[in-house]
């Protein structure tokens, strides 16, 4: 064996995740089989972000640095054979962004150590990646506790000469959620035509924007639930739930090259109608509950009033008059409730969460003290990229699992609205899989 038998960095107490402004301490451990002359032993703590225009390409076209500090552990001299430990400590900046890894870029924080040897001798280097979690407090976002509502009216033709309208209104109970929290969705559909609509679909979308020479967008569907269609001349109401899986936080504050957005999209294919609700995913849950509706004020999503046009267009007056009158809204059933569809080759990777026990479903877990960390969106098919890039597994051990449909809690789909209503007088809870 050579002179240097072991050269590695060890962080105190085996820590892997740190917060901005925290001290990072550790030792550089060295085992020598023979005396080693050296000119300097240094350790560097650094954080940076790199973005590429091609998927899974480490040749960054744009980079930015967040911190870069070096310490000299030993000056010129010679180390005898045996074990040697050199302690170090750095103070992480308060503005350091959360670690992240995606197909077009990553935010990496690491410690590097080097032994500078005399001329014509081999230098020695080692490094260790650590992770920073800068918790996003959802309560700092204005109106985060308010219901989220959007509506659209779609006019369409059918049977060559007939026309009709469909009014689609979607709402959620909050505007922001944490991992493991249930997103409550309500969709109200009024079919002002003699033709049945296609099924209504709700999708939780993630959009990651990378700033390279131009903006690159990577969009993926995180979870999806499908309801039935609405019969002709009918009003219908659809209530469902989506469990928020392990996801990186919104925005990534402190980083100007990568931005993360989340949306809930409710849509129908026939007629083509779509509403999109922006959402936030954070680490510290909203500490307020939605307000109950007050008399004379607009109702909450649980009792959202339907949007009805004042009168149909003139050319539809005869059809509306001859058609049946609208009855009370009917409740739509759910055809399928699937968290993200599995990729063709499942990745054997895991997401990092705390050991904090989950509390009742539908209320935030106690993430204020130990919020979960998810640094990666996993392997995805790029929405916009050069070439025909496909899903490629990353090498990171902290990566979002690509499979949600068959995993146990918290990746198991929550119960349907009808199932949850059956447990009257009890808190909302997951039904264990059989």
From Swiss-Prot:
Identify a single GO molecular function assigned to this protein.
arrestin family protein binding
Role of this protein: Functions as an adapter recruiting ubiquitin-protein ligases to their specific substrates. Through an ubiquitination-dependent mechanism plays for instance a role in the incorporation of SLC11A2 into extracellular vesicles. More generally, plays a role in the extracellular transport of proteins between cells through the release in the extracellular space of microvesicles. By participating to the ITCH-mediated ubiquitination and subsequent degradation of NOTCH1, negatively regulates the NOTCH signaling pathway.
InterPro entries documented for this protein: Arrestin-like_C, Arrestin-like_N, Arrestin_C-like, Arrestin_domain-protein, Ig_E-set
The name this protein carries in UniProt is: Arrestin domain-containing protein 1
Which spans does this entry mark as compositional bias, Polar residues? Answer: 330-343
Q: GO BP, one example?
A: protein ubiquitination
Give the source's domain of life in one word: Eukaryota
Give start-end ranges for motif PPxY motif 1. 401-404
Any one GO CC term of the record: cytoplasmic vesicle
Q: State where it is primarily located.
A: membrane
- Cross-referenced SMART domains: Arrestin_C
Chain spans, region Disordered: 292-349
Q: What's the family? A: Belongs to the arrestin family.
Task: Respond yes or no to whether keyword Ubl conjugation is given for this record.
Answer: yes
List the Pfam families hit by this protein, alphabetically. Arrestin_C, Arrestin_N
* Motif window: PPxY motif 2: 414-417
Q: How does it assemble?
A: Interacts (via PPxY motifs) with ITCH (via WW domains); the interaction is direct and participates in the recruitment of the ubiquitin-protein ligase ITCH to the NOTCH1 receptor. Interacts with ARRB1 and ARRB2; the interaction is direct. Interacts with TSG101; may recruit TSG101 to the plasma membrane. Interacts (via PPxY motifs) with WWP2 (via WW domains); ubiquitinates ARRDC1. Interacts with SLC11A2; controls the incorporation of SLC11A2 into extracellular vesicles through an ubiquitination-dependent mechanism. Interacts with WWP1 (via WW domains). Interacts with NEDD4 (via WW domains).
Which cellular compartments is it found in? Cell membrane
The domain comment in this protein's record states: The PPxY motifs mediate interaction with WW domain-containing ubiquitin-protein ligases.
Keywords of the record, alphabetical order, are: Cell membrane, Membrane, Ubl conjugation
Give a short account of its post-translational modification: Ubiquitinated. Ubiquitination by WWP2; promotes localization to extracellular microvesicles. Ubiquitinated by WWP1.
Please name the source species: Mus musculus
């Amino acid at each position: 064996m050579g002179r240097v038998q072991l050269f590695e960095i060890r962080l105190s107490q085996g820590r892997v995740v740190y917060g901005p402004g925290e001290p990072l301490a550790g030792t550089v451990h060295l085992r020598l089989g023979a005396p080693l002359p050296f000119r300097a032993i240094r350790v560097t703590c650094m954080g940076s972000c790199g973005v590429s225009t091609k998927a899974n390409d480490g040749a960054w076209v744009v980079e930015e640095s967040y911190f870069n500090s070096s310490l000299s552990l030993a000056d010129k001299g010679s180390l005898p054979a045996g074990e040697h430990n050199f302690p170090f400590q750095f103070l992480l900046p308060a503005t350091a962004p959360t670690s992240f890894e995606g197909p077009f870029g990553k935010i990496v924080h690491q410690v590097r150590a080097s032994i500078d040897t005399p001329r014509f001798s081999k230098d020695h280097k080692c490094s260790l990646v650590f992770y920073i979690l800068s918790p996003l407090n959802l309560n700092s976002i204005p109106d985060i506790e308010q219901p989220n509502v959007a509506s659209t009216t779609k006019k369409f033709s059918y049977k060559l000469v007939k026309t009709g309208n469909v009014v689609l209104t979607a709402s959620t109970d909050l505007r922001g959620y944490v991992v493991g929290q249930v997103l409550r969705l309500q969709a109200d559909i009024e079919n002002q035509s003699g033709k049945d609509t296609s099924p209504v679909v709700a999708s939780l979308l993630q959009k990651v924007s990378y700033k390279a020479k131009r903006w690159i967008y990577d969009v993926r569907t995180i979870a999806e639930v499908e309801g039935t269609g609405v019969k002709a001349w009918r009003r219908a109401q659809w209530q469902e739930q989506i469990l928020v899986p392990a996801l990186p936080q919104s925005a990534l504050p402190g980083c100007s090259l990568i931005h993360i957005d989340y949306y809930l999209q409710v849509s129908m294919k026939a007629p083509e109608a779509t509403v999109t609700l922006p959402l936030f995913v954070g680490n510290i849950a909203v500490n307020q509950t939605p307000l109950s509706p007050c008399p004379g004020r607009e109702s909450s999503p649980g009792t959202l009033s339907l949007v009805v046009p004042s009168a149909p267009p003139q050319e539809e007056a005869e059809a509306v008059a001859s058609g049946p009158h609208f009855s009370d809204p009917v409740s739509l059933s759910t055809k399928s409730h699937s968290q993200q569809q599995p990729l063709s080759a499942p990745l054997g990777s895991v997401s990092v969460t705390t050991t904090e026990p989950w509390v009742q479903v539908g209320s935030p877990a106690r993430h204020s003290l130990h919020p979960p960390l998810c640094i990666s969106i996993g392997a995805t098919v790029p929405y916009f990229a050069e070439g025909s890039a496909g899903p490629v597994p990353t090498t990171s051990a902290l990566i979002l699992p690509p499979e949600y449909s068959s995993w146990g809690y918290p990746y198991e789909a929550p119960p349907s609205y009808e199932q949850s209503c059956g447990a009257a007088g009890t808190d909302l809870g997951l039904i264990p899989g059989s």
